[in-house]
Amino acid sequence: MTAIHVTSEIKTLKKVLLHRPGNELLNLTPETLERLLFDDIPYLKVAQAEHDAFAKILTDNKIEVVYLEDLAAETLDTDPAIREKFLKQFINEAGINTDKYKNIVYKYLDKIKDNKELILKTMEGINVNELDAKDRNVENSLIDLVSEESKFIADPMPNLYFTRDPFASIGDGVSLNRMYSVTRNRETIYAEYIFNFHPDYKGQVEKYFDRYNAFHIEGGDVLNLNEHVLAIGISQRTCADAIEMIAKNIFNHPNTKIDTILAFNIPNSRAFMHLDTVFTQIDTDKFTIHPGIMGPLEVFEITKGATANDVVVKEMKDELSNVLAKYLGIPSVDLIQCGAGDRVAADREQWNDGSNTVWIAPGVIVVYERNNITNDFLRAKGLKVIE
């Protein structure tokens, strides 16, 4: 059995990667919300309680839960040289540019001997006031004398609990993503080290895309329809160039079974940031969908070209339901509209991820409790809905 094997959105779920919200949320402020891609400041106690409830649903259904912070810590445990390399790379990617502060932050982090505690600290962010004042030589430093007392020398990573985005599982491999924003691109360092150095994954996972590529793609835009067909959204967070690049890499890999990629061109909007926020497979013949994308949605078929550097792109001029049925090899599909088709309810519940569900077993999905109209509509369609 390979370390990763994902060929469907709707087979029985066996293993899930999570990140439990931590002190990084306490380091959000009104001034940093926009830069750190948040609309509001979550209440950490409630966020952790909701996370724990979700994790319990998974474990109660015999799904193994692994944590990003644990895998990253286990990776650093393997070799002091890997830990040193990680710290230096983290400091560079945090935008710490002066040699003085690179050395001070390295010294500060290297004092944390427990690697899980260290990983959590890198996620949490580092305030300049945490650093040793003697090392900083504050009274003789223009930088320190004019800087804000509460300045973060390394920003927190509050988006980490969206673990699907930094990398996506595709068949027996991964897309290790270059994220849309600088803020989130730092998150992919953990997956880079896990896949390169963790004993459970090192040398066992194909890489179809790398975080150092020039084009941006995020995991929320990647859906495994079956072992032969991959769906990717062209969205605010994933560009067409990245899709062509990943298509070439997948098609030219000797072990892949994927021969078709369907590119869904969704509106470039904050409300529709990823394909999985507006379109999710929830059964062999059922999908949730936000009605706002049904009219303008374009779908393109991408297949292998005559050479390794070519792909063939063809626009699918048909109803979305017919396109999906064709590539899934079934007579028809049911597109279940968020908000039960009511546009006001759809827009409201879509903002709270009403179209975004997690399939955990045949006919069983996990949803957000607050989207009651959509959830009741899903129950009426015969699905077991866990809130």
Language-model features: locations:
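The feature marks the mature, well-folded catalytic cores of soluble enzymes
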Residues: M1-E387
